[in-house]
Swiss-Prot record:
NCBIfam families in the cross-refs: PPR (TIGR00756)
This protein's encoding gene: PCMP-H77
Protein name, entry field: Putative pentatricopeptide repeat-containing protein At3g49142
Region Type DYW motif, annotated ranges: 587-686
UniProt KW keywords: Repeat
Location of region: Type E(+) motif: 556-586
Gene Ontology BP term (one): RNA modification
Family: Belongs to the PPR family. PCMP-H subfamily.
Sequence ranges of the PPR repeats: 73-103, 104-138, 139-173, 174-204, 205-239, 240-272, 273-307, 308-342, 343-373, 374-408, 409-439, 445-475
């Protein structure tokens, strides 16, 4: 709503003549009221109120109404109430309401709406209750507003009574009132009643159906929400941006089929709005599809839509997840040009994006330039240090967070503990955990406990990590046992590894990765019979190792490679160049690490299998399609991988960085690996 600041002298009455010398606003006619008739005065004052003026002007107009003895004028009263309510001054709106002697349905509706739109739901319902005493019959505008009060406050008992009142006056099946009833019952969790109202409505529009979709989605009835969308199609009701927004809670971590249905719905929409684009990007992000989110955002811009804060906060995490740094930088430039900061949400998203792209200094620049920071800002920067293996910097920043006057929350401690774990800071991690429990009195959650197990396990204290699990006050989850099993693989503890694996097979019987880990532990110990048994179990269960996948951005396009991928148009060139690189690596002493190959592969095939891991293909493709002198920090190659980098690829990346004199950054599920001149930033500790 556009609000106009009206010069006070426009009202031109004696008390305010000193304002007449000011420049008159060109947006409104000059109001000369001294010689006007009462009808003209009412008209001119009403014109000012229609502009929704600022509070100073509004009070001046109100004073003039009192001086002119126009308090009983219902037209001016209604406009005064609306203007006060728009400024969230509901008390003043109520005073105006109380001074109107004869109230009709319009006046009462405005008062109800003033309360409800400002969150005073109970007061709105009370005003509705006075209508019978005033002998005023509610209309089809009254009921939707008071039903909204019931929806927002969850007062289903009152909502049912209002439904009864609407039925008595014959309005319950009309469009506006019916929509309000569907929304009220749906949001209060009474979905069968919501459906019944919809079915009994004499006329239904897209809002009617969207209201039912919202009800199902908000009550975790995801399949029903999608079924209603399909039903809309069958009755020839077109989906709109509201339908998509209503569906968003229903398509979080859902099936690929459901995501494809929403995608199909989106592309079938005749006229797309920015809201619909934002929702579709959100659907992709809520279902771990960042590549698709980035591609859709680029398409949105190409179609002429200008992103808003919602678009940006949705797509920046996708840029981070895919290392789409060039797009992330472009969005940062847009934010600065449009002067969208200071804005904590955007600035925190920028820190996270730069951190995930391996641009630690850029993330730090955003952090340092923030006018104000919240705990999320500090946590994002601590995470940036931790993921880059700079545990000491993460711990130091955590100390500064405490000095800033903010209180670290549960997530800040998880992030700091993870940073200690990745950097091997055992004592610092122990101190952090003690600080959390003893000083801040934060009860450890499973995330904190998993970090402690990981911290102890990485430090080689596998037995202590196992005792820590045994002493836990809550039942360990998959993440806790997974951290222990990973430590057993690194430190060759077969006995405890078997115990951890047994627990994991009970908690996550369909997760192939844990079978592979146990198989690798047995293989490292030379227990080949057990390796065969594990592989046979996997085959009998139909389990396969999750395929490795790596993303790399080249010329602002994200390219995805799978292990052994031959689908890329440049595949033949990639494999030829890879063969050349492997020969050069062998000249420097490279020997393929057969421990990193699948143990059910024949020995002579292991080297071939290792050579086609996804990150190797992505590196070669980037080397072929970029030049060292191009922009972007000497054209660093940035790769994201869906699995932990294997030992062989780690060695290969070091050698390739040495051979090509190129910086290569690989972000796997654990941390960043920055390869420069044959050395990795992790110090071979990951």
């Amino acid at each position: 709503m556009k609000r106009i600041n009206v010069d006070l002298h426009l009202l031109h009455f004696p008390k305010f003549r000193k304002f007449q010398s000011r420049k008159v606003s060109s947006s409104l006619p000059k109001l000369e009221l001294d010689q006007k008739s009462p009808q003209e005065t009412v008209f001119l004052l009403g014109q000012v109120l229609d502009t929704y003026p600022d509070i100073r002007t509004l009070r001046t107009v109100h004073s003039r109404i009192i001086l002119e003895d126009l308090r009983c004028n219902s037209s001016l009263g209604v406009k005064l109430m609306r203007a006060y309510a728009s400024l969230k001054d509901v008390a003043s709106a109520r005073k105006v309401f109380d001074e109107i002697p004869e109230r009709n349905v319009i006046i009462i509706n405005v008062m109800i709406r003033s309360y409800v739109n400002n969150g005073f739901y109970g007061e709105g319902v009370k005003v509705f209750g006075t209508m019978c005493g005033c002998n005023v019959r509610p209309d089809h505008y009254t009921f939707p507003c008071v039903l909204k009060a019931c929806s927002c406050s969850g007062t289903i008992v009152i909502g049912r009574k209002i439904h009864g009142s609407a039925t008595k006056v014959g309005l319950s099946s009309t469009l506006f009132v019916g929509n309000g009833l569907v929304s009220m019952y749906g949001k209060c969790g009474f979905l069968s009643e919501a459906r019944l109202v919809l079915d009994e409505m004499s006329r239904r529009d897209v809002v009617s159906w969207n209201s039912l979709v919202v009800g199902y989605a908000q009550n975790q009835r995801f399949d029903d929400a999608l079924e209603v969308c399909r039903e809309m199609e069958s009755v020839k009701i077109s989906h709109d941006a509201g339908t998509m927004a209503s569906l968003l809670p229903a398509v979080s971590n859902t099936t690929t089929e459901n995501v494809m249905y929403v995608k199909d719905m989106f592309f079938k929409m005749g006229k797309k709005s920015l809201v619909s684009w934002n929702v579709m990007i959100g659907v992709y992000m809520k279902n771990a599809m960042p590549v698709e989110a980035v591609e859709l955002y680029s398409r949105m811009e190409a179609d002429g839509f200008e992103p808003d804060a919602v678009s940006i906060t949705s797509v920046l995490p996708a840029c981070g997840d895919t290392s789409a740094l060039s797009l992330g930088k472009k969005i940062h430039g847009y934010i600065e040009r449009k002067k969208l900061i200071p804005n904590l949400l955007l600035e925190n998203a920028l820190i996270d994006m730069y951190a995930k792209c391996g641009c630690l200094e850029k993330a730090r620049d955003v952090f340092e330039n923030m006018k104000s920071r919240d705990v999320v800002s500090w946590t994002a920067m601590i995470s940036a240090y931790g993921f880059s293996g700079r545990g000491c910097d993460a711990v130091a920043l955590f100390s500064k967070l405490q000095d800033s006057g903010l209180v670290p929350d549960s997530i800040a401690f998880v992030t700091t503990l993870a940073a200690c774990s990745h950097a091997g800071l055992l004592e610092e991690g122990r101190s952090c955990f003690k600080l959390m429990t003893d000083h801040y009195k934060i009860t450890p959650r499973l995330e904190h406990l998993a970090c402690m197990v990981d911290l102890l396990g990485r430090a080689g204290k596998v037995k202590e990590a196992y005792r820590f699990i045994q002493d836990m006050s809550m039942e360990p989850n998959e993440r806790v046992w997974g951290a222990l099993l990973g430590a057993c693989r690194v430190h060759s503890d077969t006995d405890i590894g078997l115990l951890a694996a047994d627990k994991l097979f009970q908690l996550a019987p369909e997760q192939s990765g844990y079978y592979v880990l146990l198989s690798n532990i047995y293989a490292k110990a030379g227990r080949w019979e057990e390796v065969t048994n594990i592989r046979n179990i996997m085959k009998s269960k139909g389990l396969k190792k999750n395929p490795g996948a790596s993303n790399v951005e080249v010329n602002r396009i994200i390219h995805t490679f799978l292990v052994g991928d031959r689908s890329h148009p440049q595949s033949d060139e990639i494999y030829r160049e890879l063969d050349v690189l492997v020969k050069k690596m062998k000249e420097l002493g490279y020997v393929p690490d057969s421990e990193s190959a699948l143990h059910d592969v024949e020995e002579e095939d292991k080297e071939t299998h290792l050579a086609v891991h996804s990150e190797k293909l992505a590196i070669v493709f980037a080397l072929m399609n970029t030049k060292e002198e191009e922009e972007d920090s000497n054209n660093t190659i940035r790769i994201t991988k869906n699995l932990r980098i294997c030992g062989d690829c780690h060695v290969a990346a070091k050698l390739i960085s040495q051979i090509t004199s190129r910086e290569i950054i690989i972000r796997d599920t654990n941390r960043f690996h920055v390869f420069r001149f044959g050395v990795c930033s992790c110090g071979d500790y990951w």
